[in-house]
Swiss-Prot record:
Cellular compartments per GO CC: DNA-directed RNA polymerase complex
Any one GO MF annotation of this record: DNA binding
Entry keyword Cell inner membrane: no
Family of the protein in this entry: Belongs to the RNA polymerase beta chain family.
Reactions that this protein is recorded to catalyse: RNA(n) + a ribonucleoside 5'-triphosphate = RNA(n+1) + diphosphate
InterPro entries: DNA-dir_RNA_pol_bsu_ext_1_sf, DNA-dir_RNA_pol_bsu_external_1, DNA-dir_RNA_pol_su2, DNA-dir_RNAP_su2_dom, DNA-dir_RNAP_su2_hyb_sf, RNA_pol_bsu_bac, RNA_pol_bsu_CS, RNA_pol_bsu_protrusion
One Pfam family here: RNA_pol_Rpb2_7
Protein name per UniProt: DNA-directed RNA polymerase subunit beta
Subunit structure: The RNAP catalytic core consists of 2 alpha, 1 beta, 1 beta' and 1 omega subunit. When a sigma factor is associated with the core the holoenzyme is formed, which can initiate transcription.
The gene coding this protein: rpoB
EC number: 2.7.7.6
A GO BP annotation: DNA-templated transcription
Biological source species: Bordetella parapertussis (strain 12822 / ATCC BAA-587 / NCTC 13253)
Domain of life: Bacteria
């Protein structure tokens, strides 16, 4: 496989034992695909499938008026272009959305004629609100902030059977139940009670006997019994009777009388149990019927009504028990043949028969009335209402929808195959068969369903969730339209008069803005972004709640294999409810998670890949990815470890159907980034996966020396890097953009052959981290499509780089690494290894108040000039100013109206428009504990308000930059185009041209160079074809110029029009501060194996433990953090990192030697490193220059990839260490024989430590829990309104709570005065605290404690209970 432009620069040596059969799929595909299907914006109207918006419209329309004389039909919809692009929406605080317009048709019918005919048709486009658009990276911009819609894992629609696990009844009896869950509509439950009567309930209301439902769907007691039971046939005799003999029904029964054959020979004696031999003898005797005594008939249940053949009178009813009197009545009526229900205690229970007895309804109508009374208690059951309600419950498409998934699940569970054909509502057959399966379960046949099986839980993606919301909005519109349609004819209304888009906009806005599944995007680093978009949550509307979710739902299920990650889930109350999709997982058409497998054909593992859902997978035997194969792809071992239906087993190779695609397929993106994951305890791996998402991007990202090979995929798919859309040559590079001249073969004729990539510079992310892109190509580089052109935050040469590679020593150091603390060398801080830039956005708004408008100004009274010296004339801070806490960023004054004005003064003020003389200073200041540099200022002004100088200059700058951009583009485009034209023209014959060019002359470069390039188009070529091409080129250039002018005008219009601001706001100013955060004690750091800790001390370099050659350790970790936590992966990472660095040193040594033999010796060494073990790298495909560039990039260490579950073995690490540290080097550095430990020296004393220390390189991260954000102190500040106690928390600038336990402590010490001070003047004694402040100012430290306000609150509370409480001084 050829290396891409960036991969060539630094090849990652992989230890994988097997080739990748399938690449990791695009990681954001689920989100993007789902929303694309929802919108279908680029699909022609006729080609749109019935999904998303199309489905929502077609399910609601046509809307018919109540009298049926008018209807509103849906024709098509179209999405307009969004007004602002993503970046502009983020700056202005707007939603990135496009307007939705639907073409609808109003049809009015003529009521005069016998059959209605169409009288009039009006068609019109109607605005239906704005639909938010997804950005290219799968997020939405809502009100200026990026949000993600998380997919929801919910219970699939369908029919489910379960039991209560014996918890309901004290006897521990299993009570079976069934539930039919539609996509929308009423739930239908069936359940047994402890007495084995079967009930049903609708929407969890009160239960009723199930036979009421069966009668309501039109069955009679006879047909119900016939459906659920087999019958025994009897012929009545004057005494006893004859019974039809069915052998299998007698097996295991007690004989209640002697059973004889035809000859009278007794085969089974009375009170003996009938066994198989008896049955064989009876069959041999040819017995068809058996004579039974009278009492054998007693207690049996009649299957049909018994009618007197002469009079037609009913002698006995179906489901009646046979008693002596019933028998006599039947004999009296000359009834010969009767049928009874066949039941037994073992596997044919009389449940439906018992239920019929409990049911008091007589016929279909009575049953439906009973259901109506349950659903609508207290309403009189009119016949039409009863019918309508019953139809709407399960049979109306408007109110009940199983959905395709539901229909498929119902069909497959009731044994009708796996297709989704059939109506989307319930049918009578569905109800009957569900009850039948439930009765069979109670009889001991069949299996209950596992609701945590991923075949019974499906994923609702963005598109589907948005569609449901849109539909809800349309339903509200439908009601309003129905009412107005009646008046449509009389008032001559048009479609747009009928449809109000407000409900739709409101529903969409509510969903994207405040739904539980619409979340503020986690944007700390690229990994957290990508993980957030691949998240699957069981919470949210229609899902579970934290409190009600039990252990089973949260647990790892065998079907999670390859679909949902068993490792990555939050710690805390949401554990197991929020999951991450596995690396290769995708959704199928029904929304079930699928995972890929390699098919095995004729015992050979093929490269054919099939995606299987959890249901399909249960039918196959699947081998693991690490099963040993020979060269032909056959299994080597006689027994192969496999999975079948969730169980692990060993089986012969012949029985295996599929094989895993890759060992990493069971884990998620974050977990697949942990090297040596297989050596870590699961709990720690979970922490490691979660903490990588909190890593703060460092100023200079550094690739991990030990990675897993997924780093490149994550960096590229996350969208933080810039990828080439087409191949070509880099024409121009600077910090802001990369310009690429596209290859001729990739360029479409007539299009611009230039791609310009504008880079994102110092932009704030949602978590205030810094997003900044840096170009990694140089002018003249050849790049191919998909190559990385620029690195983003936390990426290094197109690979994810969350932290830094640190030299780690595992040893205790004077207690400074007690309990996971981390000791760090000062050199790390000095080299800015963990320095990060954070961007804070501070906003100030000038509003229109009752007393006059607030004003942004530099003219603020009571402020010294030193405090204003960073503001310009408009009162806004300069870009580049360095500011610290309490500095003024934007000067603002607000009118304050303490003085009551007389009416005359008010009038004068109103006439002369003089604003109130009293103003208070409400300027925007830097909040406490923050220092930084102003990097950007944005001023937004309401339409109709005059812009200040600063706002105008910002707009001018923006326009100038844009114009320059366009001019550059134009220049490049024109140069490119003219180059192509020149190539075409040189050497061609002409018919004539400028400067008296003769006919038949041949064009030369010199002649063309002499002309102005636009004059080239005046040349008349002899060849007709080339002349056409020349004309086309001219047209395309002119068109391009025109396009650019239009684009500039558009931009200017956008910038100069007033900004949309919230009501009452005149101006809004945003100031962006860049804050540099260096590593300091109190910051949280972690490795990738869940080994987290807090920096305890930053030690001078000279005091750190160092090696024999003087290299000091960067970080000293406590070795006691490893054994009990069982995350040994970190130790292996340290060893392999040590080898990686050592190999880098060896390469650096070679490069220092003579120039001539360099490439050859380096190539030889690289071959050894890359191709001794693991998967091989193609070093031979590189040129000498490329080899040397590669070697130069490898000087700081060769990056290794050790894929999850397929990584480097101990032996391979050993080999690498030997390559990296030959004997002479090892001796010089005083390494142990294994090269994995070294003798270290104490930096303070110079003495050698008493035993060797494990030392090596680990990729260590700085997490987003920075001490600067947590550190907080307060002297005076805001107080709570009612209790007058200080507020709590840093955000409110609150105090530290002196709680109940702290009071106990002071009481225990008897420190009464301290206690009094804490509970009064330092808290809520208002007069007392004022006095103390005055006393301190005077220098007189006296405390005068009074009554705490909270005590007064208590007194008030007691008074509100009508108890008067007075305090008397004694």
């Amino acid at each position: 496989m050829p290396y891409s432009y960036t991969e060539k620069k630094r090849i990652r040596k992989s230890f994988a034992k097997r080739e990748d059969v399938q690449n990791v799929p695009f990681l954001l595909a689920t989100q993007l695909q789902s929303y694309l299907t929802f919108l279908q914006a680029d699909t022609a109207t006729s080609d749109r499938v019935n999904e998303g918006l199309q489905a929502a419209f077609s399910s609601i329309f046509p809307i018919v008026s109540h009298n049926g004389m008018a209807r509103l039909e849906f024709v098509s919809y179209a999405l307009g272009e969004p007004v602002f692009d993503v970046k502009e929406c983020q700056q202005r605080g707007l939603t990135y959305a496009s307007p939705l317009r639907a073409k609808v048709r109003l049809v009015l019918l003529d009521r005069e004629v016998s059959k209605p005919t169409i009288k009039e048709v009006k068609e019109q486009e109607v605005y239906m609100g704005e639909i938010p658009l997804m950005t290219g990276t799968g997020s939405f911009v809502i009100n200026g902030t990026e949000r993600v819609i998380v997919s929801q894992l919910h219970r699939s629609p369908g029919v489910f059977f379960e039991h209560d696990r014996g918890k309901t009844h004290s006897s521990g009896k299993l009570l079976f139940s069934a539930r039919v869950i539609p996509y929308r509509g009423s739930w239908l439950d069936f359940e047994f009670d402890p007495k084995d009567v079967l009930f049903f309930r609708v929407d969890r209301r009160r239960k009723m006997p199930v036979t009421i439902l069966l009668k309501a769907i039109g069955m009679t007691p006879e047909s119900i019994l016939a459906h659920f039971f087999d019958f025994d046939n009897f012929e009545l005799k004057s005494e006893g009777g004859m019974m039809e003999f069915v052998a299998e029904r007698w097996k295991g029964e007690m004989a209640r009388f002697d059973i004889a054959d035809r000859d009278g020979k007794v085969i089974v004696e009375k009170d003996k149990r009938i066994n198989a031999k008896h049955l064989r003898d009876l069959a041999a005797g040819g017995i068809q019927r058996v004579s039974v005594p009278e009492d054998f008939l007693y207690g049996r249940v009649l299957a049909k009504n018994i009618v007197d053949p002469d009079t037609g009178e009913v002698v006995a009813h179906a489901n009646d028990e046979i008693t002596e009197s019933v028998l006599n009545a039947m004999r009296a009526a000359n009834v010969r043949d009767i049928q009874t229900l066949y039941t037994n205690d073992l596997d044919r229970g009389p449940y439906i028969s018992q239920t019929l007895r409990a049911d008091e309804t007589a016929d279909q109508m009575a049953a439906r009335v009973a259901i109506y009374r349950m659903m609508r208690p207290g309403e009189p059951p009119a016949e039409e209402a009863v019918e309508a309600l019953f139809q709407r419950l399960f049979y109306s498409e408007e109110t009940y929808d199983l959905s395709r998934v539901g229909r498929m699940k119902v069909n497959s569970r009731l044994g009708r195959g796996d297709d989704s054909t059939g109506p989307m509502t319930l049918t009578n057959e569905d109800i009957l068969e569900t009850i039948k399966v439930l009765v069979e379960l109670r009889n001991g046949r069949g299996q209950i369903d596992d609701i945590d099986h991923l075949g019974n839980r499906r994923v609702r993606c963005v598109g589907e969730l948005a569609e449901n919301q849109f539909r809800a909005g349309l339903v509200r519109v439908e009601r309003a339209v129905k009412e107005r349609l009646g008046q449509a004819e009389t008032e001559n209304l048009m479609p747009h008069d009928l449809i109000n888009s407000k409900p739709i906009s409101a529903a969409i806005k509510e969903f994207f803005g405040s739904s539980q599944l619409s979340q503020f995007m986690d944007q700390t680093n690229p990994l957290s972004e990508i993980t957030h978009k691949r998240r699957v949550s069981a919470l949210g509307p229609g899902g579970l709640t934290r409190e009600r979710a039990g252990f089973e739902v949260r647990d790892v299920h065998p079907t999670h294999y390859g679909r949902v990650c068993p490792i990555e889930t939050p710690e805390g109350p949401n554990i197991g409810l929020i999951n991450s999709m596995a690396l290769y997982a995708r959704l199928n058409e029904y929304g079930f998670l699928e995972t890929p497998y390699r098919k095995i054909i004729d015992g050979k593992v093929s490269d054919q890949i099939d995606y299987l859902s959890a249901i399909e997978e249960s039918h196959y035997v699947i081998a693991q990815a690490n099963a040993a194969l020979d060269d032909e792809g056959r299994f080597v071992d006689d027994l192969v470890a496999c999975r079948e239906a969730g169980e692990t087993m060993l089986t012969a190779p012949g029985n295996v159907h599929y094989m895993d695609v890759a060992p990493s397929q069971i884990v998620s993106v974050a977990a697949s980034l942990i090297p040596f994951l297989e050596h870590d305890d699961a709990n720690r791996a979970l922490m490691g996966a979660n903490m990588q998402r909190q890593a703060v991007p460092c100023l200079r990202p550094e690739k991990p020396l030990v990675g897993t090979g997924v780093e490149r995929t994550v960096a590229v798919d996350s969208g933080t890097t810039v990828q080439a859309l087409r191949g070509g040559v880099v024409d121009h590079v600077d910090a802001d953009r990369v310009v690429i001249r596209v290859n001729d073969e990739e360029n479409v004729a007539g299009e611009v052959g230039v791609d310009i990539y504008n880079l994102i510079k110092y932009t704030r992310s949602n978590q205030n981290t810094n997003i900044n892109q840096r170009p990694i190509v140089a002018r003249g580089d050849k790049v191919a499509k998909g190559d990385v052109l620029a690195d983003g935050a936390s990426t290094d040469l197109g690979e994810l780089a969350l932290g830094q590679n640190m030299l780690i020593a595992f040893m205790p150091w004077n207690g400074y690494n007690f309990e996971d603390s981390i000791l760090i060398s000062e050199r790390v801080v000095a080299d800015d290894r963990y320095t990060s830039i954070h961007i804070e956005e501070l906003t100030v708004v000038a509003r229109d108040t009752k007393l006059g408008p607030e004003e942004i100004t530099r003219d603020i009274s009571n402020l010294a000039e030193t405090q204003l010296n960073r503001l310009d004339d408009s009162g806004i801070v300069y870009i580049g100013a360095e500011v610290s806490a309490d500095d003024v960023l934007v000067g603002k004054v607000t009118p304050k109206g303490e003085t009551q004005l007389t009416p005359e003064e008010k009038l004068l003020r109103a006439i002369f428009g003089e604003k109130a003389s009293d103003v208070k200073d409400t300027s925007l200041r830097v909040s406490s504990g923050m220092t930084g540099t102003v990097i950007d200022v944005q001023v937004f002004t309401r339409e109709g308000i005059v812009r200040d100088k600063r706002a105008q200059s910002i707009i001018d700058d923006e326009l100038r930059r844009y114009r320059q951009d366009l001019n550059d583009q134009l220049r490049i485009v024109e140069n490119d185009q003219f180059d192509r034209i020149e190539k075409m023209l040189v050497g061609k014959a002409v018919n004539g041209g400028p400067r008296k060019l003769a006919k038949g002359a041949t064009l030369t470069k010199a002649y063309l160079a002499d002309l102005d390039r636009w004059q080239w188009f005046d040349i008349r070529l002899a060849d007709e074809q080339h002349a056409v091409v020349l004309e086309q080129a001219k047209e395309s250039l002119e068109q391009k110029r025109h396009q650019f002018d239009l684009a500039f005008e558009e931009k200017r219009k956008k910038l100069t029009q007033g900004d949309e601001l919230p009501p009452g706001v005149l101006k809004m100013i945003k100031v962006y501060l860049a804050v540099k955060r260096r590593l300091q004690p109190g910051d949280k750091m972690a490795g990738r194996h869940g080994n987290k800790g807090v920096v305890s001390r930053i030690t001078p370099v000279e005091d750190m433990p160092h090696m024999a050659d003087g290299t000091p350790a960067d970080i000293v970790l406590n070795p006691l953090g490893v054994p009990s936590r069982m995350n040994v992966g970190q130790v292996l990472e340290v060893h392999l990192g040590w080898a990686a660095k050592g190999v880098g040193y060896r390469i650096a040594d070679m490069l220092r030697d003579e120039r001539t033999a360099q490439a050859k010796s380096v190539r030889g060494y690289l071959e050894k490193v890359y191709n001794t073990t693991g998967s091989s790298a193609h070093i031979d495909s590189l040129t000498d220059e490329e080899v040397l560039e590669l070697a130069n990039n490898l000087k700081k260490g060769v990056p290794f990839a050790t894929p999850v579950f397929d990584g480097a073995t101990e032996e391979e690490i050993g080999k690498m260490l030997e390559l990296a540290y030959p004997d002479d080097v090892a001796a010089r550095m005083r390494l142990t024989a294994s090269r994995s430990q070294a003798w270290l020296y104490d930096g303070r004393t110079g003495e050698q430590f008493e035993r060797p220390v494990t030392i090596g390189y680990m990729h260590y991260l700085k997490l987003h829990h920075l001490v600067d954000d947590k550190m907080h102190a307060r002297s005076t500040g805001p107080y709570s309104l009612v209790t007058q106690q200080p507020l709590g928390g840093k955000a409110q600038f609150g105090g530290q709570r002196f709680g109940e336990m702290e009071v106990w402590a002071l009481e225990a010490y008897g420190a009464s005065y301290t206690l009094q001070e804490m509970l009064t003047v330092k808290s809520d004694d208002i007069t007392g605290r004022t006095k103390v402040y005055e006393n301190i100012v005077k220098g007189d430290h006296v405390i005068d404690a009074g009554m705490p306000e909270s005590f007064n609150v208590l007194v008030k509370e007691i008074r509100s209970l009508a108890l008067d409480m007075d305090l008397e001084r004694n």
